[in-house]
Structure formats: C-alpha cells, structure tokens
A protein has these predicted regions:
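Extended, histidine- and acidic-residue-enriched regions that form the cofactor-binding/catalytic faces
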Residues: 1-108
Length: 108
C-alpha cells in the first residue's frame, strides 16, 4: 500500500480486527464460520491453542510460520465459539469496512 500510494495511486487497505490473543482459528474465526453455516466446523474437535497476544509471538511466527508458535495451529480458543457471536463480528466488520470505503471515496 505504501508503495502504491508513493506512486500516486489512490488505494485503500482494510483488514478485519479482533482481539490480539485470538488471531487464527480461535473464537472469532470459528464463530464467523459457524454464522455462515460452514460445514467444515466441528466444535467437538475444537481445542484451545496458544493465547498469547500476537505482538508477543509475531517474530517467531514470521520466522517459522504457525507451527513454530502453535502445535495445533490455533491462535486463540475456539471452544466457546457460536454463530451469534460470529454474526455480530460480521456485522461489525461490515460496518467498519463500509465506513473505511466511504471515507476513502471522499478523498478521491
């Protein structure tokens, strides 16, 4: 994005936000998938992973990938995930994306 903007291109970068200790296959991701009725979600198989904040593990994650920081590949705790939480997260993400695009479009 920085390079594109330096080249004079009007671009927007947006990514969904969440808790720093729940960043991959944890409560948030699993709840979102449940809200979308994803057939691959098996809560009976859900188990907690590493729940350290992302800033605490980011260097190891960049060096060695997910396996370097979490034996089961989970960064968070999906065991209490549910579709209602997932729907609320999707609503929040949608609102923040629409707001970001609206603000970005005003600058054009």
């Amino acid at each position: 994005v920085r390079t594109l903007r330096a080249e004079g291109r009007n671009v927007l970068a947006w990514s969904p936000t969440g808790r720093a200790d729940d960043t991959h296959a944890g409560h948030i991701d699993t709840s979102v998938l449940l809200s979308l009725a994803h057939p691959g979600v098996d809560l009976a198989a859900a188990e907690p992973g590493v729940t350290l904040p992302l800033p605490d593990i980011i260097d190891d994650l960049r060096r060695g990938g997910l396996a370097a920081v979490s034996p089961n590949g989970v960064l968070g705790d999906p065991t209490h995930a549910n579709a209602d939480d997932g729907a609320a997260v999707l609503d929040r993400w949608t609102d923040t994306l629409v707001a970001a695009v609206t603000e970005w479009a005003r600058r054009d």
